From Swiss-Prot:
Family affiliation: Belongs to the aspartate/glutamate racemases family.
Example GO BP: regulation of cell shape
Organism: Chlorobium phaeobacteroides (strain DSM 266 / SMG 266 / 2430)
Superkingdom of source: Bacteria
Encoding gene (name): murI
Protein name, entry field: Glutamate racemase
One Pfam family it belongs to: Asp_Glu_race
Keywords, ordered alphabetically: Cell shape, Cell wall biogenesis/degradation, Isomerase, Peptidoglycan synthesis
Length: 272
């Protein structure tokens, strides 16, 4: 792949398996409102968390190639599953363009904020099975105890817009019971779909726990990297994000409004 030289006016490229990465788009807009954003949601193949590592690595290459065709100055992997199993594929495909994954950003923040060194992680089956969060956290502080729980139904519930549904509360209660007796004071939302279910998650836990939203963590890290490289945009205002999707689900407009709290801009359909 032919690589390009990034400039301050180049866009920030972000990809995810579906609409969950829009939480990262929102966080980037809040942190850096002047930045142009290209977002690719692989809505035709969501969820990634139930796929094999080989398939996830294949998708990671294809998703990155789509973003690279738009000449970004940085690529944010807004998919924890790809961050856990295929970040090296993204980095190889991106060449000289820097890559930031949500997983490392979330792990770093969890280590900084935990007070009792008991951290919980929720994520897709693939992310949890990879042990990537626990490895990243204990690499930074070996004294931290990490308890992980796969919550595979959270992604389809978020994609359906079931943010306050009784079924969501029932499933959350079942999943989060895994943390009973572990005295966690910090919980990492190890999937970018999960912040949309944050209210149900915090209510279900019934105690004061610091919630780590990897979308917010990655926005701060992105700003620092771009500032250090003198690649922050000099524009006054940015246009709406340029949205690319591999399929246009009937509920996409509703989901966009749910995640972004704004109306859906133009959407471009791309083949994968």
């Amino acid at each position: 792949m032919q690589h390009h030289k990034a400039t301050p006016e180049s866009p920030i490229g972000i990809f995810d398996s579906g609409v969950g990465g829009l939480t990262v788009v929102r966080a980037i807009q809040a942190e850096m409102p002047a930045e142009r954003i290209i977002y690719f949601g692989d809505t035709a193949r969501v969820p990634y968390g139930t796929k094999s590592p080989a398939t996830i690595r294949k998708y990671a290459h294809e998703d990155t190639a789509i973003l690279m065709s738009h000449l970004p100055k940085i690529i944010i992997v807004a998919c924890n599953t790809v961050s856990a199993l295929a970040l090296d594929v993204v980095e190889k495909t991106a060449g000289s363009i820097p890559v930031i994954g949500v997983l490392k950003a979330g792990a770093d923040l969890a280590v900084q904020v935990t007070r009792n060194k008991h951290v919980g992680v929720i994520g897709t089956q693939a992310t949890v099975s990879s042990n990537a969060y626990a490895d990243a956290i204990t690499l930074l502080d070996a004294n931290i105890e990490v308890v992980s729980k796969a919550c595979p139904l959270f992604v389809p519930l978020a994609e359906e817009g079931f943010t306050e549904h009784a079924a969501t509360r029932l499933i959350a209660s079942d999943y989060l019971a895994a943390f009973d007796g572990h005295d966690i004071d910090t919980l990492v939302l190890g999937c970018t779909h999960y912040p949309i279910l944050r209210h149900v998650i915090t209510e279900t836990l019934h105690r004061d726990i610091r919630i780590i939203d990897s979308a917010e963590a990655v926005a701060g890290r992105t700003r620092k990297l771009l500032a250090d490289a003198k690649l922050l945009s000099t524009e006054k205002h940015a246009p709406p994000p340029h949205l690319l999707v591999s399929d246009l689900p009937q509920k996409f407009s509703m989901l966009y409004k749910l995640f972004m709290e704004s109306d859906l801009p133009d959407v471009e359909l791309v083949e994968v």
